[in-house]
Amino acid sequence: MRPLIRCANAADAPRLPAMFTEYRTRDLPGIACLALLALLCPASAQDFDLVLAGGRVLDPESKLDAVRHLGIRDGVIRAVSAMPLRGRATVDASGLVIAPGFIDLHQHAHLPADYHLKAQDGVTAAFELEVGTADVDAWYAARAGQTLVHHGVSVGHIPCRMAAMGDRPTFLPGASSVTATNPASEAQLADLRRLVERGLERGAVAVGFGIQYTPGATQWEILEMFRAAAKFRAPCSVHIRAKGDTGPLNVFSSIQELIAATAVTGAPAHICHVQSTANRHTPRALELLTAARARGLDVSVECYPYTAGMTDIRSAIFDPGWQERAGIDFADLQWPATGERLNVASFAKFRQTGGMVIVHSNPESVVREAVAHPLTMIASDGLRGHPRHAGSSARVLGHYVRETQALTLMQAVEKLSLLPARRLEGRVPAMQNKGRVRIGADADLVVFDAAKVRDRATYDQPDLPSEGIRDVLVGGVFVVRDGALQRDVTPGKPVRALVK
C-alpha cells in the first residue's frame, strides 16, 4: 500500500503538536484522531514553493500512474502525495499528465531560439552527443547562465579529427576533406586520442562519432577512441559507418564494429538514429543489438519519429553508390529552403554549394516498429529545417501513442525521459535525479494533455511549436506556462561530468 504522503526527510513530515509528544495510555483515542487529521489535512503541515495539484503522475521508474499532488521546494520534488498540499503557489493539473521532463540526447542546434522550440516540445535537457565539440570548456562557457533548458555535450571524434589533421573546422566534413578521407598517421592518432581524453577530463559527458562522415577512419582508430572513453566510463554515441546490406561495409558490419568495440574495451556504445541509418534493415539491426544486450554488453539505441532524415549534401554519405546503399534516388531528396525535390542537375548544383538536405528514406512501418521497440529511446537529431527539431516528443505522444497505439503512454514517457537519463548516469551521477517523478528528483517536469498533444511542425513549416503541452518546469521554474513560452527566465544548467 502506498503512503498517502511521502516526504523527503523527517523534517518535512507532518508533526503533531508538541503537547502530544508525551502521552498516557488513556490519551490514545484523542491522539489517534489528531494524527488522522494530520494525515487527511497535510496542507496544514507542509509548505512548498509550488504545488502541482491533482494531475495524473507518470513515473517510469516506479511505474506510478495515479492522481497525485507534487510539492516542490528549491527546485526539487519534496513530496508526492495522494492528499492535497499547501504551497506558496498552486497550479491545478487536474485532467492533465505530469511526467518527468523529456531528455533529448541528440540535439545539434543549441541557440536560444532552438531551446525555445525544445521547451515547447517538453524537453528540459538537450545534449549534443553525436558530433560534439573539440573544446568542451568553450562550449559550456558560451551558454553559461543563458539557457532555458539544461544542456550538455560530448567530445567529438569529428572535430578532434579536424584539429589533429589541421583541417578547417566545420560542423560536418566535406566528402573530399582530409578529415573525411585520410587515414590517421601514428602521430595524428596519438594527437587525436590526446584531444579526446582532454575533452573527457574537462567534463564531456560522452564521446561522439559520425563514422559515416569519416570513412578514412580505420576500425583501429575507432577502437582507440573507445579505449579512451572506457578510461572515463564515458558512453560512445555513434552514427555508424555504413548503410545497406551489400558489400563488406554494410549496416550489419557497422553495428558489429561497435558491439566488438564495447566487448573489447568496456566502453558503452549508443547507436544514433537507428531507423535513419539502417532504414529497411532496422528490424534486423535491433535484433543484433537486443542479442548483444542479452549477453551482457552495454549497448543502447535511439530513434526519431519521422520517416525522413536530414544531413549535409556535401558529406561522404552522398559519395557514388548512395542510391544503392540507401535504397533511394534523387527525387527522395528535398531542399528545405525551397521545398523542391531534387534531380540530377539540382543535386549536382547543391553538392557543390553545400547545405542540409532532407532525405525521405523510410516507410512509416519501419519508423513505427523502431519507436515501439523495447530497446529504443527517443532522440530528435534536432536541426533547423526538419520538423524533428520542433516536434519529436509531441509526435510520439500524439501520433504513436494516441492515434496508432503503437505503444502505451508510460512506455513513451520512459523512452523520452528515464532511458536517456540512465544512459548518462554512469558518467554523470546527477542524471540519477532526472527522468523520474519521485522525492529527491529534480523538478524538471512536463504537464500535458494526453488527448490533445501533437506535433505541428511539417517539412514545409518545420519550426511550428508543438501543442497540448501546457507547462514545462526546469529546476522548478516555469519555462512554459499555460502554453506560453517564458522568455525572461534562464534556469537551464550545464550537465557535465567531473572536471579535472
Residue ranges and their predicted role:
Residues L189-A190, R198-Q256:
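Divalent metal-binding pocket/active-site signature
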Residues R161-R168, A175-A217, I259-A263, A267-L409:
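Active-site neighborhoods of metal-dependent hydrolases
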Residues M19-L28:
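Helix-loop element at the rim of GNAT/NAT acetyltransferase active sites that forms part
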Residues C33-L34, A43-R68, R73, A82, ...:
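Active-site microenvironment of metallo-dependent hydrolases
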Residues M1-A10:
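Conserved N-terminal entry element of GNAT/NAT acetyltransferase domains
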Residues G101-H108:
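Metallo-beta-lactamase
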Residues M83-A99:
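Active-site metal-binding motif and surrounding structural segment of the metallo-beta-lactamase
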Residues A93-I98, P112-G208, L297, Y306:
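Divalent-metal coordination cores built from histidine and acidic residues
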